[in-house]
């Protein structure tokens, strides 16, 4: 069997198409990793990852969970206080959809989250509650990588109840 010769312009076109496709897949993978990094940052209180997750001018809206809206740093500071009484957190992010904008320099993303939290001793007096919903984001490609520029947390399900008299620490 002999190979069919491919004309040079066609080779160039195929190469450019392949390179573009690989670049898009690399961006998609990087955005997936960004969502996982956010979950790790929150669950393990690794706030040093903040600049690897959020753009410097990022905003967040966590009002649907009883939280606040503001700069990402303000909202993450609030979240740190809100989660302080809950030492065990397991964040799951899944079903991520990515719609690129502007020559793949930004994208709109939506993903589901499930966030069980626990306090007390496992098998004894442990209290577990869980919230679920959507993260609706605008992410932006920066020289150092993809970052969340805008995040809206839309809580849609709450399983369990907060303890009576529970208040988020100041």
Model feature map: region roles:
Residues 1-40, 44, 48-52:
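Short, low-complexity N-terminal intrinsically disordered segments enriched in polar/charged residues
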Residues 2, 108, 132-165:
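Short beta-strand edge/turn micro-motifs at domain boundaries
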Residues 42, 54, 113-115, 152-155:
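Short beta-strand segments enriched in hydrophobic/aromatic residues
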Residues 47-116:
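A solvent-exposed, acidic/Ser-Thr-rich amphipathic alpha-helical stretch
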Residues 91-93, 130-135:
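Short, surface-exposed coil-to-beta transition loops
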Residues 167-169:
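Flexible, surface-exposed loop regions and adjacent strand-edge segments
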């Amino acid at each position: 069997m002999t190979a069919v010769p491919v004309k040079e312009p066609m080779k160039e076109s195929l190469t450019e198409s392949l390179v573009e496709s690989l670049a898009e897949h690399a961006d998609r993978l990087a955005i997936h990793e960004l969502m996982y990094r956010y979950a790790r940052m929150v669950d393990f209180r690794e706030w040093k990852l903040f600049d690897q997750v959020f753009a410097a001018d990022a905003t967040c809206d966590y009002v649907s969970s009883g939280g606040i809206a503001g700069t990402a740093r303000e909202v993450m500071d609030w979240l740190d206080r809100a989660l302080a009484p809950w030492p065990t957190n397991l964040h799951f992010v899944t079903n991520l959809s990515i719609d690129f904008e502007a020559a793949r320099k930004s994208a709109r993303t939506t993903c589901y989250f499930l966030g069980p939290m626990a306090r007390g001793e496992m098998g004894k007096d442990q209290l577990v509650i869980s919230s679920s919903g959507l993260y609706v984001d605008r992410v932006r490609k920066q020289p150092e990588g993809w970052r969340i520029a805008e995040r809206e947390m839309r809580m849609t399900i709450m399983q369990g109840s907060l303890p009576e008299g529970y208040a988020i620490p100041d």
